[in-house]
Design a protein with these regions (language model features):
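Short glycine-aromatic motifs
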Residues: 6, 62-64, 145-146
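Acetyl-CoA-dependent GNAT
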Residues: 10-89, 94, 99, 118, ...
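Conserved acetyl-CoA-binding loop-helix of GNAT-fold acetyltransferases
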Residues: 98, 104-117, 142
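Short glycine/proline-centered loop/turn elements that form peptide/ligand docking sites
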Residues: 108, 112, 133-136, 153-158
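Conserved GNAT acetyl-CoA-binding A-motif
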Residues: 119-132
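Conserved catalytic-core motifs of GNAT/GCN5-like acyltransferases
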Residues: 128-130, 141, 146-160
Length: 161
């Protein structure tokens, strides 16, 4: 594994076209399971969802951020997050993933620390994320997140800070 630092590339709304195919692959390969309905799967892979997120990227407040993680010259993963200043600086990590060749080597931790610092620089005071697998739960706990009940959809929620 390279010791190069993680670089975060913020994607603008105009640049997000390259994000969506990667996001859809991530959802299909890593996120969807037997608890997700066909309607859920269709929505999160739809132009409707994409349009809603892209509109949220243009909001003046509580704007969605799409980022690419780079180590050296390699694009190793992606994330989406939003900082809610009207909720005490809550940073909701909507999506966070590394491409399979870069997993289980410490790069996920490095990417999270880079994302946390970037979000704190933008006003984040605390962090929240949903998880959908035991492995994801262990990963987020290893970064200092603690269980925080469920969200409005009944999905398990974790919090840090």
């Amino acid at each position: 594994m390279s010791s190069d630092p993680i670089r975060i590339e913020q994607r603008s709304r105009a640049q997000c076209g390259t994000f969506w195919p990667l996001h859809w692959d991530y959802l299909v390969q890593d996120m969807f399971d037997e608890t997700d309905t066909e309607a859920d799967r269709a929505y999160f892979c739809s132009e409707e969802y994409r349009g809603a997120v892209e509109c949220a990227m243009a909001r003046p407040a509580n704007r969605v951020h799409q980022v690419f993680f780079h180590r050296g010259s390699q694009h190793i993963g992606c994330a989406q997050y939003v900082i809610y200043q009207d909720e005490g600086g809550k940073c909701l990590i909507m999506d966070f993933w590394l491409f399979p060749p870069y997993r289980r080597q410490g790069a996920g931790h490095d990417c999270y620390w880079a994302l946390e610092q970037a979000a704190r620089d933008e006003g984040a005071a605390w962090f929240a994320i949903n998880y959908h697998s035991d492995g994801a739960h262990r990963f987020w706990r290893s970064l200092g997140f603690a269980d925080d009940g469920t969200d409005e959809y009944g999905d398990p929620l974790m919090r840090k800070g």
